[in-house]
Amino acid sequence: MLFPTEFDVIVVGGGHAGTEAALASARMGAKTLLLTHNIETLGQMSCNPSIGGIGKGHLVKEVDALGGAMAAATDESGIQFRILNSSKGPAVRATRAQADRILYKAAIRHRLENQPNLWLFQQAVDDLMVEGDRVVGAVTQIGIRFRARAVVLTAGTFLDGKIHVGLNNYTGGRAGDPAAVSLSARLKELKLPQGRLKTGTPPRIDGRSIDFSKLDEQPGDLDPIPVFSFLGRAEQHPQQLPCWVTHTNERTHDIIRGGLDRSPMYTGVIEGVGPRYCPSIEDKIHRFASKESHQIFLEPEGLTTNEFYPNGISTSLPFDVQLELVHSMRGLENAHILRPGYAIEYDYFDPRALKASLETKAINGLFFAGQINGTTGYEEAAAQGLLAGLNAGRYVQEKDAWCPRRDQAYLGVLVDDLVTRGVAEPYRMFTSRAEYRLSLREDNADMRLTEIGRELGLVDDVRWDAFSRKRDAVSRETERLKSTWVTPKTLPPEEATALLGKPIDHEYSLAELLRRPGISYDGVCGLKGGECGPVEPLADEPVLLGQIKEQVEIGIKYQGYIERQANEIERNDANENTRLPDGIDYREVRGLSFEVSQKLNEFRPETIGQASRISGVTPAAISLLMVHLKRRGLGRRNGAAAETTEQGGDTVPTQQ
């Protein structure tokens, strides 16, 4: 049956990538259909009950700055909030929250059901409708055909998923949900390059059987309580709960080693590669054999359940081994396991077959986002989903794709890494992956992206109004600190000594004083009995006031470093944005080695910047490529047509 309504964009899958994709597409005015195998699992946290962390929290803030749902849903469902690396520099500080699974899922579903231009439909997708080199719709398991001009595929771990517990295995997309076997087979028919990856999850524990008196308590931050969204307030948070800490020991490790002969990972049953930075407990005791103990965090799953998530013991060992290893740890001697841990293998598709817009190079209008691209993590999925949904909507509206740069957003780093380097293992975001991380901080994600989001149609009036007030207040206050002066005559020596350690000997602006180590914004604003404070309130809301003060302080203290990084970005811009002609044959570039020309012809980079980051492409090869392009440009000056970048980059002649 052909469904009577035609849509602009169809999103397949209702996880973290799919929900952000559907919301983004609908926000910018595209008529969007979200197809999911089960409406009850929209926004489900399939693995750990947490959002954020180092690098990951940066992505969540960027999704929020672009109008996405993840941060706001976390503020409404978070039962513990912490700032990681709070004693370190602002570039690596990151927000992390424990979330109540039920509340988080409800917050996401509420947004989906109340988003204009968005329709939901419950049916698994078995096939894509493809005409020539473009996608035109999707077909469900009972044969309903939905037509659309673009499709965003966010299938997570469901593509030909296989669940392993010991040497037992069965098909499944996650515990309790069926795998997407037919859809996986259809994608293989389309000759898209694919492989297998693996991830895992730990056994869940009944909190009533845990002896908390033997554990170390880990509370969240309370003064102040962090928020995730730039529009968030601490009052939105539900009741806050602590996490708890225990440790593995030598007996635990002996139990694990004794079960490796029945481990699907160590007997070759699992062929997929697992995540390096979220290893199973089997991997940990094998890779870090000299380590006597590993820290395990017991994380509450919610306010209305006794279930705990033991972060750090992801495993696919047989259940009897899981039971024994859990009981070997302090506080868990009598623990009751509610759900066994398991590993899951699934299909992914080589992201080097994607454009930077996340559209497939082979099939027009088909976009991929999330674990199908070889990433791991809710946050990485949500960020890709937002970008894919946005660009699917722009594709339908016949507008140029928006592709964030590496110097613009962690989202830009994520996508550029995927489409230029591919993945050999599940990809996870870290701050260390960003070369411009001082400019890509959590605190300035809105300053970097909200204006762009407004232009793209992603940011509503409420967010825009709050952002505009913050932006203007930061600018005014920064200028005030630069233009407000204190002198030895106007600043009493005892007051200067209390703040600076000694009296001042000449005139200083408040900004100059603030640049000194250990001096805070509140400190300089309190000088002269508070006379140096702002004449007018910076903001009505305490959260917004805190954001403004933070922005002003960081901007002034790190001004020199930030300007130096901006100059470096400007120097690199020419190569980064120079687009390569679609039809170029790299075998014709004089001096390129066979290996380099083969890689460039295979992966078809869109810009010189992308080409420079492909493994094996040397700086010398880039120089040869630039010479080749300049020669052709000189030879085509007289009226030759030229191809320009979609984002305003340099002009490179097209090849004829």
From Swiss-Prot:
<comment type="similarity">
    <text>Belongs to the MnmG family.</text>
</comment>
<keyword id="KW-0285">Flavoprotein</keyword>
<feature type="compositionally biased region" description="Polar residues">
    <location>
        <begin position="644"/>
        <end position="656"/>
    </location>
</feature>
<comment type="function">
    <text>NAD-binding protein involved in the addition of a carboxymethylaminomethyl (cmnm) group at the wobble position (U34) of certain tRNAs, forming tRNA-cmnm(5)s(2)U34.</text>
</comment>
<dbReference type="GO" id="GO:0050660">
    <property type="term" value="F:flavin adenine dinucleotide binding"/>
</dbReference>
<dbReference type="Pfam" id="PF13932">
    <property type="entry name" value="SAM_GIDA_C"/>
</dbReference>
<dbReference type="InterPro" id="IPR044920">
    <property type="entry name" value="MnmG_C_subdom_sf"/>
</dbReference>
<dbReference type="GO" id="GO:0030488">
    <property type="term" value="P:tRNA methylation"/>
</dbReference>
<comment type="subunit">
    <text>Homodimer. Heterotetramer of two MnmE and two MnmG subunits.</text>
</comment>
<feature type="binding site">
    <location>
        <begin position="274"/>
        <end position="288"/>
    </location>
    <ligand>
        <name>NAD(+)</name>
    </ligand>
</feature>
<dbReference type="InterPro" id="IPR002218">
    <property type="entry name" value="MnmG-rel"/>
</dbReference>
<feature type="binding site">
    <location>
        <begin position="13"/>
        <end position="18"/>
    </location>
    <ligand>
        <name>FAD</name>
    </ligand>
</feature>
<dbReference type="InterPro" id="IPR047001">
    <property type="entry name" value="MnmG_C_subdom"/>
</dbReference>
<dbReference type="InterPro" id="IPR040131">
    <property type="entry name" value="MnmG_N"/>
</dbReference>
<dbReference type="InterPro" id="IPR026904">
    <property type="entry name" value="MnmG_C"/>
</dbReference>
<dbReference type="Pfam" id="PF21680">
    <property type="entry name" value="GIDA_C_1st"/>
</dbReference>
<keyword id="KW-0520">NAD</keyword>
<protein>
    <recommendedName>
        <fullName>tRNA uridine 5-carboxymethylaminomethyl modification enzyme MnmG</fullName>
    </recommendedName>
</protein>
<dbReference type="GO" id="GO:0002098">
    <property type="term" value="P:tRNA wobble uridine modification"/>
</dbReference>
<keyword id="KW-0274">FAD</keyword>
<keyword id="KW-0819">tRNA processing</keyword>
<dbReference type="InterPro" id="IPR036188">
    <property type="entry name" value="FAD/NAD-bd_sf"/>
</dbReference>
<feature type="region of interest" description="Disordered">
    <location>
        <begin position="636"/>
        <end position="656"/>
    </location>
</feature>
<dbReference type="GO" id="GO:0005829">
    <property type="term" value="C:cytosol"/>
</dbReference>
<keyword id="KW-0963">Cytoplasm</keyword>
<dbReference type="InterPro" id="IPR004416">
    <property type="entry name" value="MnmG"/>
</dbReference>
<dbReference type="InterPro" id="IPR020595">
    <property type="entry name" value="MnmG-rel_CS"/>
</dbReference>
<dbReference type="InterPro" id="IPR049312">
    <property type="entry name" value="GIDA_C_N"/>
</dbReference>
<dbReference type="Pfam" id="PF01134">
    <property type="entry name" value="GIDA"/>
</dbReference>
